[in-house]
Amino acid sequence: MTTHVKPIVLVGPAGVGKTTVGKKLANSLGLSFLDTDALFVKDHGPISEFFAVNGESAFRRLEEDYLSYALSSSGVIATGGGAILSEANRQALKVATVVYLKTDGTHMHKRLSQGTRPLLKN
């Protein structure tokens, strides 16, 4: 008999390590891993470029779709840093075990300075 496991969703600010922790957690538990930002990039290209052309609101609408898709799995899901800003996403997350990750500012600054995060340019 197979037991359905609630998805485990990692939330937290950009650069906290949701993807890194998510991959390790999924591997340890023998579960699948999905990264909603990676799914977005696969379909639409770099998030920073999408932001520049289409704006944050267009990104957030699509982000809701990717989270909804990911929640249909029973694995570990890493969300984008702003995913919980959406009321629709907060409601959707009620079906999951949600884990908030945090770290110190020095660690996050080091991670974020290595990439192109669209909201850091504001």
List PLM regions with ranges:
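ATP-dependent small-molecule kinase phosphotransfer cores
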Residues: L34, A38-A92, P118
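A glycine- and Lys/Arg-enriched "phosphate-lid" helix/loop adjacent to the NTP-binding pocket
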Residues: V95-N122
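Phosphate-binding P-loop
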Residues: M1-V5, Y69-A70
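P-loop (Walker A) phosphate-binding loop of NTP-binding proteins
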Residues: P13
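Hydrophobic anchor at the beta1->P-loop junction of P-loop NTPases
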Residues: L10
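Walker A/P-loop
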Residues: T19
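Short glycine/serine/threonine/alanine-rich loop segments
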Residues: L31
